[in-house]
Amino acid sequence: MLRLFRANPSSVKVWRPISTAVYSVRQNSSASKPISESRVSISEVEKDSKDEKEINEVSLPWYLRDDITSSLVEKKEILLPEIPPHAPPQVEEFLTLMACDYGMDNIMLFDMTQLPDDHEYKENNKDVDFIVVATGKSEKHIYKAANELRTHLKHKYNAMPSIEGMVSSAITPSMRRRLLRRARKGPLATDNDYGKAANSWVICHHDGIDMHMLTAPRREELNLESLWCKPEDADKFSQDSFVTSESDHIFSGIRRYHTFARAYSSATSDLESIYYKLQSQPVDAAEEELKRLQNLFEQSFSHPSIKDHGLRFQFWKTLHLARPDLVSLAQVEDALLAKYCSAESLKADMTQEKIDDITEYVKLLIDTPTRDSHKASVDLAFDRLSKIISTLYTFSNEKFSVAKNPQLVPLLWRLTYVEVKEPVIGSRDVDRFIQEQVAVATSPGPVITMASNRARDILHLIGYHTKTHPGSVPTASLRELILFTYGNAGKWDKFWQEWDNYCFEKNFTPAESVEKWTRICVYLSMRRNKAEALRFLENYWNNASSVAGSVYKSLQANGEEFNSPDERVAFKRALTNMIAMFETPEKVPFEGILSYVDQL
């Protein structure tokens, strides 16, 4: 066990300002005489020296004196974990940085190389040899430490480490652009937000060493040590329940209520810890382990709150997505409806809770492995959804409204089709092509099966929602989702009709028009459908009679400028790829387009 000490402020030498030093000299200048003109004894010299020191100390402000720290304040002892002899020197270096430079406490080191061979976190199962866990004082403290650690690794090892959970509160111009790009995308069915504070858990990975920095409440809640410890040390990291005791103190009633709150909080933390362990399981996890976690969760599910019921639904949903043979879709539905059978639901306002749960349930219907590629599965999914909505709102004065959650409408549209071939080109693929120059090739034919009647119903719902909520119009991401759905289903007539209607209804600026044409070019180039590429070049490149306008006129109106260099490169590359689909004789009419694109 290594013992280090943080520097005591009293031992740091204080540099006085020049003005203070000059002032001290002037105070004693009248007493200084040449040696030949004065004869003084040693005692007089010592007395003068002592007087000068006292004058200097009196003249100094208190914050510049050396004795500003009380002698009663002890140095804080830092205990570092024992370092195995086979550990690389970086382990000791990182431990010292955490303790002495960054001020972390309660530091632990876990050696993955000493775990049993069948352990999940054995070094040959994971790309990690050592794990360091430390506690920070606050989220801001952890962010500062993570930033310093990243700078240290960058300058000393010439490497940019992988850091997760580090979130800056500042909004840079590049972040604003990313947020704007993200706003154009449709909501993802697999997106999850667990409401944890930013920088409460930051992970840095470098050269086989993971460094976890957590706040004390988050570390106690997750109990990560139980995942990486040796089997014989598991009891050391088990979380003990809080024990209450009777008291005749006058405030015992208040303390009792406080104790109950802590007990519920502890139960919630246990459920979250079990849920985290379930998420950490590998894809091929044994059925016995999943059943053990399932039983452990149900045993800990006592005095449930509304939050606990929501966590239970997420737990069963995760189990169903991983092993539908172990947990059926009907069981997940029962876990969802159990929330509204509890006494807590009668006391709370469940208006927003209902619409959020319906949104999560739609995500479940989209992601469930039991969904096949036939149109009948779409009808079955909508039937299940209608029954859930009916159950939640039958004996309620509330009315179901899609306006209360902006994610719901895109998810309902996503529920109208099933994928039959991969990949299916979507908005994210177009974004990757523009931002990262990553192209995805797909089959030119239909890659999804679409339930046209259900799609028509959702369009009617969107139209009704637009009429009943003035000022509410379908977002650009939703319109693009609908457009790409028609293209992926091979319904190209509806695709171009939707494109014409969209461009006719919206009064785009020249810059917005260039962006829209770039995205449609990228999509068509990745779909690789020769007939639709030909239709685009003939009807939309420079056709004055087109309802949607033309690419050439939009470029001219914007001064042949693009919104970013990446957008320019993506446009030129996509248009070149589209023309390259044709054989040489067919390519001749488009030589003028190629020449124009080359000079952009």
From Swiss-Prot:
Claim: Repeat is one of the keywords in the record: no
Domain of life: Eukaryota
Disulfide bonds: none
Main location: mitochondrion
Entry's localization field: Mitochondrion inner membrane
Targeting presequence: 1-35
Keyword annotations from UniProtKB, A to Z: Membrane, Mitochondrion, Mitochondrion inner membrane, Transit peptide
GO BP annotation list: mitochondrial gene expression; mRNA stabilization
GO cellular component: mitochondrial inner membrane
Membrane topology: Peripheral membrane protein
Gene3D superfamilies for the chain: Beta Polymerase, domain 2
PANTHER family listed in its UniProt record: ATPASE SYNTHESIS PROTEIN 25, MITOCHONDRIAL
Record-stated family: Belongs to the ATP25 family.
Protein role: Probable mitochondrial mRNA stabilization factor.
Protein name (Swiss-Prot/TrEMBL): ATPase synthesis protein 25, mitochondrial
Organism name: Clavispora lusitaniae (strain ATCC 42720) (Yeast)
Taxonomic lineage of the native organism: Eukaryota, Fungi, Dikarya, Ascomycota, Saccharomycotina
